[in-house]
């Protein structure tokens, strides 16, 4: 983790994926767990603000910039001048008292089209595939067969995404009861029985069979990635390799 004092009111913190792992957190966790967001931000603030110039300030804002290598976190003390700057920045910064805004901000940065064009060209490709898959799933005349596997950790999801490249299937990643589940929806008319069997064999190298049903995940689980979870994981964590 690297810290840079931009000025007397702003600290820039570069948080790598290794730093996130050490803290038992991922970018995906920051998309939905609001209490974890708040606790994580303040733990970082406590580490870098050794002089307590920011912790003692009642109005602290956090700006989050996710990237492939982790996060950049800008921590700012609010002053009258800051308020003027905030007006020109729109929603660039997030009030620490409203951590629920942070997950939306992270999603916006991950989906931004005009920022970091090379990075997001891969995301657009994944989004296009997701739209094609959604069209297929919405066609009631197209039969599907579904399997759910339980991942031992999110790192196993990354490892699986590296080797499993589905041609005619959807993949949905859920978090349920502190575990990750991958739902694989195969398009029967577009796949052979042998290809489905082979793809499941690859999945079982990194995950295990589970009795948790798709309906349970849909109703009680947290949907993290929809339709193209494997490709999105490759893009965000493997550089779309």
From Swiss-Prot:
Annotated stretches, region: Disordered: 77-102
InterPro entries given in the database record: MecA_C_sf, Neg-reg_MecA
Domain of life: Bacteria
Gene3D superfamilies: 3.30.70.1950
GO MF entries: protein-macromolecule adaptor activity
Acidic residues bias: start-end ranges: 80-89
Pfam family, one: MecA
Cited HAMAP family: MecA
Self-association state and partner proteins as the record states: Homodimer.
Biological role: Enables the recognition and targeting of unfolded and aggregated proteins to the ClpC protease or to other proteins involved in proteolysis.
PANTHER family recorded: ADAPTER PROTEIN MECA, ADAPTER PROTEIN MECA 1
Family named by the database record: Belongs to the MecA family.
Swiss-Prot/TrEMBL domain comment: The N-terminal domain probably binds unfolded/aggregated proteins; the C-terminal domain interacts with ClpC.
Protein name: Adapter protein MecA
Gene that this polypeptide is encoded by: mecA
